[in-house]
Amino acid sequence: MEEPYFSTTNTTDPTTRLAFEMRKTEYEFWVNQVPELDSDFELVTQSLYRTTGVNEGRIVHILMALHRLEELPELQALQHRLYHLDLDRIIAINKSLNRLGNPTPEVVARIDEQLTAYLTPTRPNQTMRTQAQIKRKLNELINLADDTLAGTQGPTQ
C-alpha cells in the first residue's frame, strides 16, 4: 500500500519536485535569518530588506511566524520532514494563533498536536490544505481553548 503524502510533495512529478525544492530552500533561507530574541529586530528587518528586496512588513511576518513555529515542536518537526507548508501558510498559522494572547503551555501543546494531525497527510496524493482551511481549523482549536480557559476561570463579576 502506498504511503500517504500531499500532492505538493509527490516525488514522482518533476514539477512538484521543483516546487518542493523552492519551498524548502525559501524556508531554510528564512529560518537562518531568524534573529536571537535580544537582537534589534528593526535593524535585522532593515538589513534583510536591503539584501533581499523583500518588503519589511513581509519580513516581519515571516520572522515572527518562524519564531512561532519554534513554539510548536510537533508541527515544526513535520515541516522539517515534509516541507509542505509554504511561508504564507506558516504566516497564517501565526496570525491565527496571535488571538490566543499568552496561552498556557498545555493549550499550546494541545493545539500543536491537533494542528500537526490536521496537517499530516492521511492518503496518497491528498490535496494540501489551503490557508483558509488551516485558519478555520485553528479558529476551531482556539475557540476550544477559549472555552476551556473560560471554564477554568470561573464566573465574571
Q: Where are the regions that the model predicts?
A:
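Conserved C-terminal region and hinge/linker of Rieske [2Fe-2S] proteins, especially
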Residues: 1-157
